[in-house]
């Protein structure tokens, strides 16, 4: 029978949901027709990892004509229950059978508010790219066949953060367009001119008189200026909840043994009554460990700690395989903005390459602020709920109990979000964490007196 989509009758050769390597291999194999990925990069939930890897392949092979993301918008329907309006999906209307949240797979939510991964797509798709050569000269590459770079204002600025100096380059519209106004940033890039100098580990001493309690590898109590600053212990913690991609790939089943940390040693050095140096070592005792969801520690702070300032990648959420659009900078925001509220709750809020991080009460109170400084880049997530609340698989944000504490994860590294499909493909190997090699990291905790 005749099918207009059959390769025999089509002017294009098309495939669906390849990995970047599979896309490259298919393009090399197909020698008679242009290749397109009719659908790729399934944007469901916390997704769109490894997006740059796709376009490294596409730009390197002129026989690849392009690819189409699935999808643009989450197809949720506004619904109100008990005075709370939320985005409903399959099963919220008594419909059986249903596809649950499988239609919640866009770059923007139903109200067209961008998800964090929207900005990664915007960055990778930008028509101009900027390259810096060994002499410091910036080269502009125009990938748009119909728009000359002269239509943009190219500007740059340098920003210094301590020892680190970065150059930001922007291409802005010179005039209003039907789709954006004058000054809209069409393309941007960041170059590190002078890298950040992470501090050296201090000489260890125990002269401080901090009121602390330590149980094994866990710091269980810390009283600062008469206040207990911990609502839950600072402890080694290698588990993380799933996102939609990981749920479909049985991530929790494959990594379940990491709900209990093994082969870890933590050293706490009291510098003074407000400052503690934390060093963690993981040394595997066997060679058959599965990948690790994350390598790091967690703690719980008072629920009043809802104002955040940090120096790292942002301002939006980013993960190791989805961080190119998130530039280094100092960002200030409330906890509610630091979190990402996905329509179906899942792992969220990570920030990569954090140099320092501060969190404390919004108003001026007697409660001290916590400052964290890494001796290497950190990954940090913060929520006003716990991992167990996400592991319980709530259907909607209002199903999560909030306001009991602030949950803070301070990590060396975290598993990437993935971004090929949401029915079994796994995160690319370079964005996973090998459970069979050692890890060491360190950070300083300092509870600053309020000014």
Residue ranges of model-derived segments:
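Beta-strand-rich binding/interaction modules
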Residues: 134-173
